[in-house]
């Protein structure tokens, strides 16, 4: 497969990479030297020779134990294992697990772009550098359409869609003020029993109980508790699930295969 070249205005060569700034004031200076990868942990995390763990910004790969996790880890290893990488930062350099958060390059290869384009990772809302959001979304659409990687066995792909995301309004205490509306955009009835719905975090996903959705019909997944109906499901959580500043709604079928990935920005709006 052809390499993905770093998009302009970043296509500058490694030498210039080490001294230039992108969008003055928005991006921190790049490191003075490349860093060697000593270990590939999973599909979106590596460890450097100095012991630091680097989490790839802007994407999520399947978690260990999930379908395709081994394939995603191998794809990442093929790209960066034992190689020198250049890290590009924007905004916070740390995430909640104290791993370094960065965009990663091997020569002129944009590692996140390769993983998404090959279908081994999905795009997330967390984009320290917004210039990559559209690029990664385009790669994901290409991978989805081509049925690559995690999208290869998505027989339900494109049939279930997100129509609305309503994060909880600040100050509201009712967890059911937060919800996601899904629609069956296909032509056949969908048996959603056992399907998994999750956000960008590593918290356990919502497992859909016995439930089916006819073509053209919608259902709402509320964060709080309530009685299930033909068009309403309840997660049973008390705390916020969907981040007001933006998040990603991911749905997998009962076999763990990816059905959809919907990223939204502040207030549930579509990202620009």
Predicted regions and their residues:
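Small beta-barrel nucleic-acid-binding modules, primarily SNase/OB-fold domains
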Residues: 3-6, 11, 16, 23-272
């Amino acid at each position: 497969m052809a390499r993905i070249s770093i998009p302009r205005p970043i296509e500058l060569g490694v030498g210039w990479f080490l001294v230039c700034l992108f969008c003055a004031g928005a991006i921190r200076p790049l490191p003075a030297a490349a860093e060697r990868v000593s270990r590939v942990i999973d599909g979106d995390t590596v460890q450097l020779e100095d012991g630091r763990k680097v989490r790839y910004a802007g994407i999520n790969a399947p978690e260990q134990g999930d379908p395709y996790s081994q394939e995603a880890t191998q794809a990442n290893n093929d790209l960066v294992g034992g190689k020198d990488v250049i890290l590009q930062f924007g905004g916070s350099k740390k995430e909640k697990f104290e791993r370094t958060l960065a965009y990663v390059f091997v020569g002129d290869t944009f590692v996140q772009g390769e993983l998404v384009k090959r279908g081994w990772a999905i795009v997330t809302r967390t984009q320290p550098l917004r210039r990559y959001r559209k690029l990664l979304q385009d790669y994901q659409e290409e991978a989805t359409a081509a049925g690559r990687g995690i999208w290869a066995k998505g027989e339900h792909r494109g049939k279930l869609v997100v129509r609305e995301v309503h994060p909880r309004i600040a100050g509201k205490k009712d967890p059911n003020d937060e919800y996601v509306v899904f629609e069956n955009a296909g032509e056949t009835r969908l048996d959603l029993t056992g399907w998994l719905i999750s956000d960008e975090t590593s918290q356990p996903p919502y497992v859909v109980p016995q439930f089916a959705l006819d073509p053209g019909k919608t259902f709402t997944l509320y964060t709080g508790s309530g009685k299930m109906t033909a068009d309403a499901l309840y997660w049973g959580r008390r705390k916020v699930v969907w981040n007001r500043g933006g998040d990603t709604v991911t749905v997998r079928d009962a076999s763990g295969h990816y059905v959809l990935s919907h990223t939204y920005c502040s207030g549930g709006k579509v990202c620009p």
